[in-house]
Amino acid sequence: MRKQVAIFTDGSCLGNPGPGGYGAILRYKQHEKTFSAGYRLTTNNRMELMAAIVALEALTDACEVVLSTDSQYVRQGITQWIHNWKKRGWKTAYKKPVKNVDLWQRLDAAIQPHTLRWDWVKGHSGHPENERCDELARTAACHPALEDIGYRVEAQTSGGRAD
């Protein structure tokens, strides 16, 4: 039987684009690990994606994962939009490059060993783990130390509709 793991995530950006950070909590039974990092120039969506990626990449075994996020962009992207993006060679319905493709591809790879359920939680509504992740993300955004190389590349391309 696979380990049952809960992951909670959030991203933050002080300005969009601007300094940003992510926060994640990984919980297995009574054990918890937190993750956070800050980037000098990024977007809120990139930080939401990074939170999920980092937590999933920390898992060393195939697990049953319930991942809770307040980002509809992440939840819908990974459960709905990604299928057509891949069929179209990572292009939107308008034949534009998918924004944040580097992170979508990384997230897609990170979920492969696992069975996932994606839960949406309303942000800033008192959900304890979401509030903790928000605090981790905001603190990291206030002390950015990393360069978001993918954002710099992404900034040179135009977006389009998400699907």
UniProtKB/Swiss-Prot annotation:
- Superkingdom classification of source: Bacteria
Q: Does the keyword Metal-binding apply?
A: yes
Q: What is its main location?
A: cytoplasm
Record's keyword terms, sorted: Cytoplasm, Endonuclease, Hydrolase, Magnesium, Metal-binding, Nuclease
Q: Which residues form a coiled coil?
A: none
Quaternary structure, from the entry: Monomer.
List the HAMAP family: RNase_H
Q: What does this protein do?
A: Endonuclease that specifically degrades the RNA of RNA-DNA hybrids.
Family recorded in the similarity comment:
Belongs to the RNase H family.
**Know the name of this protein?**
Ribonuclease H
Q: Which organism is it from?
A: Sodalis glossinidius (strain morsitans)
Classification of source organism: Bacteria, Pseudomonadati, Pseudomonadota, Gammaproteobacteria, Enterobacterales
The protein's gene is named: rnhA
